[in-house]
UniProtKB/Swiss-Prot annotation, chains A, B:
Homodimer. This is Proline--tRNA ligase. It comes from Methanococcus maripaludis (strain DSM 14266 / JCM 13030 / NBRC 101832 / S2 / LL). GO terms for biological process: prolyl-tRNA aminoacylation. The keyword Protein biosynthesis applies.
Length: 460, 460
């Protein structure tokens, strides 16, 4: 099955996201999908809270004159902004944009809060919906008109040094986040022509989808003093001088969810990383005539034992076990535990791993410990598999002075192996003309195994 | 100080909400305010999750034809809907409403999901931003153009009986929620002319603000089959017949936060209920020359002891203790613990309650237990005080056949005691004409101490 078909199919069948809403690029997070989102963003929140970021909530509407304040920024967004022009039947005096992102909103407010160096650093974030009038093909959780979950962090600092250090902190946080949700990544410094509108430079996380195309899943922008000058974010330094703050911003969206689904899934359905799984363990009783009560009693006991540490679901529906297996494999539940009369007689239980399909018979008396062990193997394996997949998608080419010959080789490799092609850095090909020649995107400058490359790929 | 002045003042000074945004009725949840919101809505989420409600996320934009599908419903909202008319520079073919509430969105989708009685009950909720083009005076967290937090639950049932039972469940949940965040309430069945547009009837929670005006803080609507017929929510019953589902919906907004602030605050600032306090205990070291290290070591130890159960903050700023006391009293931190050299010598610590101002010397060796005891007294006291306040605002009048004389008495009482006036039910005054006569609102039918009354009040 083609990846994109598999993807649409699994979103519907596993109850992740329903796109049958009468506006293109707008859909519904279904209960199961919402739980994955909730657990994922809780991990992100925890990482941010622990490093001194404060959660806030800013307005969704932006007056036109405020959005237009930063020239480059508005140029980057003006074709894709939704505009509110009426309240009831009354035309508004100033039209209002649905936030495409919140720099202008947040920096307008920061102006009220930042007066002196002791007000800094300021490290804020919010998790909100944002909007883009996409005219291109939309794709659920990947290219939406309503991005339902956008975690955007915005920081302000007294010195360039602290600002640069914040970029490092953001990269570290995002690495930790993607590691925890099991999504592998390649980090690149985006080329000038593809950086965030208004930024000094942009660092980006890309992952690779099963079809070999890359997906941008996180960005970290060093804004320098650009926005600060526009928004007059001036403060008094310890020496009593005036200076503009240095700023960073960084964001992660629903694409994190799309990616953890896409990277791990297989032909049977989802394979969910343990930490974000709505159900971590499903219990299936194997009922035989006359033994129903013994089995149900035992499996309820097991449910209680495991509940203290895991999100467990006891599937006691009156359908045959085989159908239950299929249902929960489709939904990507990490572990399934089967318990029948013979298991109980022998003091055993059967654990089945979703990632490898492996069946493991364990001592019932020791089950919590056994489950913990298998859960940590599952985590380790998912991480390894994801990293291997990404590695298998990376090809290193030699640089050649003959641009035409080089670009032919790149194109051939992109057709053959897909994924990311790395070429040792050379200024002569680091430009948009090269993108046109290879009919693919320059992701930017990527450090890989200690060396610096230009990375190129077909992107989503 | 006037209540409304106190309220605006405290939002700013305590860092709850900043309204200096260039759109009327739109503002920013600041870090401290956001935490109160987060803890409050977590309580609500937990209550909903435990009773089988599933969290979801639906689109924010509603096509005009979908919003207009239910005639009464759209009539109730059409004057206050914000309309998106353009994407970039392109006029949209169908204009899009910013959701004022999500009945139409959700029921359009329910049509895709409900086919047969086994698909029921369906109990969904979401916590989202909603929008009203308010032309009246706006007020932070009370009357907003962007309602930043709206928890809306929507359920569908196979029978009227189950639907009615769901109304009871919703009332029970909301009671538990307001009890936990310490906001007292009076429940009324709203009169016909004030029910939710499209509902069979509306039950509402009102609390009373310090100025004697009531604030609607939660509503529970029995929609019967009204929306189901419009949205064709038909299903196959166990007998193979066709029927329309029975529906309820119920919502709680930022007003819950506004109310817990307003009901408990005093002239020194906020008094926050323990369960939603961003900081539950603040530790203040009393430093004397030469004893700094002893005190700091001990108070760090105390911090570690208490952290296991409470949200604790150690205030080690280099300012005098008096200023710290003021800061944390303003922010409404439930308990303050002071520790100085003499306390350490005597094996004591001093605990100060924010609600009563009481100072309690406790044995340091037993401090966790002592704190737990005081915390539970604090909770109990806040609940009692809030209930007493509401009771003191309730006046019962006798019914009189002479409507003019009765309305004069109501008006006098409203001037004198403010709050809610209860009048034994009589059909002759249960109408909008009576509202005009008394220049106040009929809240509806209220059961109070076992009897049924018509309740009237000045409302926000």
């Amino acid at each position: 099955m083609e990846f994109s078909e598999w993807y649409s199919d699994i979103l519907e069948k596993a109850g992740i996201y329903d796109l049958r809403y009468p506006i293109k690029g707008c859909g519904v997070y279904l209960p199961y999908g919402f739980k994955i989102r909730r657990y994922s963003f809780e991990i992100l929140r925890k990482l941010l809270d622990e490093t001194g970021h404060d959660e806030t909530l800013f307005p969704m509407l932006i007056p036109e004159n405020l959005l237009a304040k930063e020239g480059e920024h508005i140029k980057g967004f003006e074709d894709e902004v939704f505009w509110v022009t009426h309240g009831g039947k009354t035309p508004l005096e100033v039209k209002l944009a649905l936030r495409p992102t919140s720099e202008t909103t947040m920096y307008y407010m920061m102006k009220q809060w930042i007066k002196v160096h002791t007000d800094l650093p300021l490290k804020l974030y919010q998790v909100v919906n944002t909007f883009r009038y996409e005219t291109k093909h939309t794709r659920p959780l990947i290219r939406l008109r309503e991005i339902m979950s956008f975690k955007e962090a915005h920081t302000a600092h007294a010195t360039k040094k602290e600002c640069d250090a914040q970029i490092e902190e953001a990269l570290t946080l995002y690495k930790a986040f993607f590691d925890e949700i099991g999504v592998p990544y390649v980090i690149s410094k985006r080329p000038e022509w593809d950086k965030f509108p208004g930024a000094d430079y942009t660092m980006a996380f890309d992952t690779i989808y099963p079809d070999g195309k890359t997906m941008q899943i996180g960005t970290v922008h060093n804004l320098g003093q650009n926005f600060a000058k526009t928004f007059e974010l001036e403060f008094e330094t310890p020496d009593g001088e005036k200076d503009f703050v240095y700023q960073t911003c960084y964001g992660i969206s629903d694409r994190a969810i799309a990616s953890l689904i896409s990277v791990h899934g297989d032909e049977k359905g989802l394979v969910i990383p343990v930490d974000v799984a709505p159900i971590q363990i499903v219990l299936i009783p194997l009922l035989f005539k006359g033994k129903e009560e013994i089995v149900m009693d035992k499996i309820k006991e097991l449910n209680n034992t495991l509940k203290s540490e895991f999100r467990v679901h006891l599937d006691d529906r009156d359908i045959r076990p085989g159908r239950k297996y299929n249902d929960w494999e489709l939904k990507g539940v990490p572990l399934r535990i089967e318990l029948g009369p013979r298991d109980i007689e022998n003091g055993h239980a059967l654990i089945v791993r979703r990632d490898t399909g492996e069946k493991i018979t364990v001592e019932y008396s020791n089950i919590l410990e056994e489950v913990e062990k298998i859960v940590s193997m599952y985590k380790e394996n998912l991480k390894l598999k994801a990293e291997e997949k990404v590695k298998s998608f990376i090809t290193v080419l030699d640089f050649e002075n003959d641009v035409n010959s080089l670009s032919e080789k790149v194109k051939a490799k992109l057709l053959e192996n897909k994924g990311i092609i790395l070429i040792p850095f050379n200024e002569s090909i680091y430009n948009e003309e090269f993108e046109e020649l290879i009919d693919a995107s320059v992701l930017g400058l990527t450090t890989y195994e200690g060396k610096e490359y230009i990375s190129v790929a077909r992107t989503y």
